[in-house]
Amino acid sequence: MMPRLQQHKIILRQLGLQPYAPVSQAMHNFTEFRTDTTPDEIWLVEHQHVFTQGQAGKTEHVLMPGDIPVIQSDRGGQVTYHGPGQQVMYVMVDLKRAKIGVRQLVTAIENTVIETLAHFNIDSHARPDAPGVYVEQQKICSLGLRIRRGCSFHGLALNIAMDLEPFQRINPCGYAGMQMTQVSALQPGVTVADVQPVLVREFTRQLGYPTAKLQPWSLSDYLLSSHSSSSVL
């Protein structure tokens, strides 16, 4: 059954193109210092070129990173790539307050992507053996979450209009030979800006939120000196 969260405001923040590490630290700080009344948030960001290793990551799946940095992350899953033209959406949801479980959230995120792609006439599906969203046998969206004190952070990475070559330098999500695809390969001309409003609308619909309210984002708001730092992002 779909959760109904009409009474729970959700805030949307547009971050633009950002390096991974400071945004990850900001997300950790937000989660660490949020309270029972803090509204849930969605962050939309494109990251500068980076490989991130999830908690289950193994070094043998990083084949030839070359000039792209590899950063350890505390999200679920294994290694993936982020770069310009890929829409990352971080979802900071108080699961306790929403009375939903992790599996429900994962399903909602996967359905968000499936419905977003359907809007652009792309058929896709989730797989029970490998989190994410796929078009036939090719992966188009990766997913990795972390739960702390009953609240989610991290989220999804949807390939839209990017250079897919760096995925050849890794075994994406720990699968040797995993083929990647993107929205623009299936529907030429579609951009990140085209996808963003559909993605946000579908996520709020999946969880029954009211319309997300766009508010400004400043990194300095999240990296205050009183906030603790973390070496694992």
Curated annotation (Swiss-Prot):
Keyword Transit peptide applies: no
Main location: cytoplasm
A Pfam family annotated for this UniProt entry: LplA-B_cat
Site label Lowers pKa of active site Cys, positions: 139
Residues that coordinate or bind substrate: 75-82, 142-144, 155-157
Protein name in UniProt: Octanoyltransferase
InterPro entries documented for this protein: aa-tRNA-synth_II/BPL/LPL (IPR045864), BPL_LPL_catalytic (IPR004143), Octanoyltransferase (IPR000544), Octanoyltransferase_CS (IPR020605)
The organism of origin for this protein: Yersinia pseudotuberculosis serotype O:3 (strain YPIII)
Subcellular locations according to the entry: Cytoplasm
EC number, UniProt record: 2.3.1.181
Summary of the function given for this chain in its UniProt record: Catalyzes the transfer of endogenously produced octanoic acid from octanoyl-acyl-carrier-protein onto the lipoyl domains of lipoate-dependent enzymes. Lipoyl-ACP can also act as a substrate although octanoyl-ACP is likely to be the physiological substrate.
Pathway assignment: Protein modification; protein lipoylation via endogenous pathway; protein N(6)-(lipoyl)lysine from octanoyl-[acyl-carrier-protein]: step 1/2
Keywords: Acyltransferase, Cytoplasm, Transferase
Sequence similarity: Belongs to the LipB family.
Catalytic activity: octanoyl-[ACP] + L-lysyl-[protein] = N(6)-octanoyl-L-lysyl-[protein] + holo-[ACP] + H(+)
All copies of domain BPL/LPL catalytic, residue ranges: 36-211
GO biological process: one example: protein modification process
GO molecular function, one term: lipoyl(octanoyl) transferase activity
